[in-house]
């Protein structure tokens, strides 16, 4: 995601779409001029890792047509055909997440650091976001919908759009159109029911692409996805996969953090047989807050452990036939590049002690009773012994 465009915060879709800011952004992008809010994408691309803009444009066959129809001043007569809606409502407090993306982290932030986030849900703005998508569907302008969070299956906006899509799909003039709208999700798969109805039954009619946000399996999953239960999630995976994979579109989006990489053999034991599309992510420190940094970062481990686990993970993916594996390999290789560039920082003993203290402090607020060091003891004895001696 880009950084916030503060001057356009909570403007209407019409105001935003052809604002002076967005017109200039389009002109700059076509000219190859860097956009200051897009630093994250540029960082990824320099490391040979797919950025959000790369993945988004890959699935848009109309992109060249849209660019060709752009006016000289950067304005567009056509309205958006791609909607990316991210709710903040969530039931997990994932270790790799933060208060920008999860409502549970807003409460955690206050509890851990006595920082009172003045965030208030703007229900009218949320409702209008859903109306914008519905109006685009009515006009047959929308070609792609991305739902993320938070947890999208907890979002009333999401379900209002799904209900409308279903109603449109029953009409002859919309049946084929709705069928061809590409809908994809980033979901933690903790929810299987909405208002006493099975979610798979409610969304089956458009066969979305599920990008399951699941970090590892068993103890690794339950630590990384703090608040999650592996038995429930693995059961939901089975159910969603059996209903929503008619076009081999089911996928997984794991954050490649240290426990996930160290526990990669169990990851393969569970997921490989399903042949999921890979949408795995780099581990990043959210919103640049140093106090959020933890030993989820594999680059913090000493060279001999880092090389062993990262190269083993690269080897597992290289030898697999999983679709999308090349970007996952690129992510793992980007860790090697970054660590080599900052080796003195990652091996600084005071720095490591500070990060360990932050990790231990975060562990005091876990919803589960298994701390980071206890997970390490299960998945990698050598890493556990080194960590305990910091």
Could you say what each language-model-derived stretch is?
Residues 1-121, 138-139, 328-390:
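N-terminal pre-core extensions flanking Radical SAM catalytic domains
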Residues 1-11, 106, 123-128, 202-390:
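Radical SAM enzyme [4Fe-4S]-AdoMet core and its adjacent flexible, acidic
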Residues 14-17, 94, 159-166, 238-241, ...:
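Non-transmembrane alpha-helical segments in soluble domains
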Residues 29-32, 73-75, 136-137, 174-176, ...:
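A general structural signal for short secondary-structure junctions and capping/turn motifs
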Residues 77-89, 98-128, 140-158, 169-195, ...:
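Core AdoMet radical
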Residues 101, 165-169, 244, 275:
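Active-site catalytic pocket residues across diverse enzymes, especially alpha/beta-hydrolases
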Residues 129-133:
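Conserved RecA-like ASCE ATPase "motif II neighborhood" in helicase/translocase motors
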Residues 159-163, 194-201, 263-267:
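Distinct, well-ordered alpha-helical segments
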């Amino acid at each position: 995601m880009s950084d916030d465009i503060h001057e356009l915060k909570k403007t209407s879709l019409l105001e935003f779409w052809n604002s002076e800011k967005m017109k200039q952004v389009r002109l700059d992008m076509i000219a190859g001029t860097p956009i200051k809010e897009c630093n994250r994408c540029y960082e990824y691309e320099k490391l040979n890792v797919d950025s959000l803009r790369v993945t988004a444009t890959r699935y848009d066959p109309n992109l060249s047509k849209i660019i060709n129809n752009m006016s000289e001043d950067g304005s567009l007569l056509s309205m958006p055909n791609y909607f990316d809606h991210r709710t903040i409502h969530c039931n997990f407090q994932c270790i790799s997440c933060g208060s920008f993306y999860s409502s549970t982290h807003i409460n955690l932030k206050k509890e851990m650091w006595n920082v009172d986030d003045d965030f208030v849900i703007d229900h009218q703005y949320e409702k209008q976001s859903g109306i914008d998508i519905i109006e685009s569907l009515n006009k047959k302008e929308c070609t792609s919908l991305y739902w993320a969070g938070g947890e999208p299956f907890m979002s009333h906006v999401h379900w209002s759009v799904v209900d409308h899509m279903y109603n449109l799909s029953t009409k002859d003039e919309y049946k084929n159109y709705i069928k061809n709208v590409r809908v994809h999700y980033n979901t933690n798969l903790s929810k299987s029911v909405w208002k006493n109805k099975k979610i798979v039954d409610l969304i089956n009619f458009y066969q979305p692409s599920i990008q399951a946000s699941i970090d590892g399996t068993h103890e690794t999953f339950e630590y990384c996805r703090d608040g999650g239960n592996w038995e429930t999630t693995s059961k939901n995976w089975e159910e969603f996969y059996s209903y929503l994979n008619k076009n081999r579109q089911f996928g997984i989006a794991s954050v490649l953090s240290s426990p996930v990489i160290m526990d990669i053999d169990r990851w393969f034991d569970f997921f490989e047989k399903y042949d999921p599309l890979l949408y795995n992510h780099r581990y990043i420190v959210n919103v640049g807050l140093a106090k959020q940094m933890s030993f989820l970062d594999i680059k913090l481990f000493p060279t001999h452990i880092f090389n062993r686990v990262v190269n083993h993970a690269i080897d597992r993916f290289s030898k697999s036939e999983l679709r999308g594996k090349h970007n996952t390999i690129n992510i793992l290789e980007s860790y090697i590049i970054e660590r080599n560039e900052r080796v003195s920082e990652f091996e600084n003993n005071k720095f490591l002690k500070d990060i360990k203290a932050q990790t231990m402090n975060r562990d005091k607020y876990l919803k589960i009773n298994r701390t980071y060091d206890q997970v390490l003891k299960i998945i990698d004895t050598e890493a556990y012994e080194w960590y305990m001696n910091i």
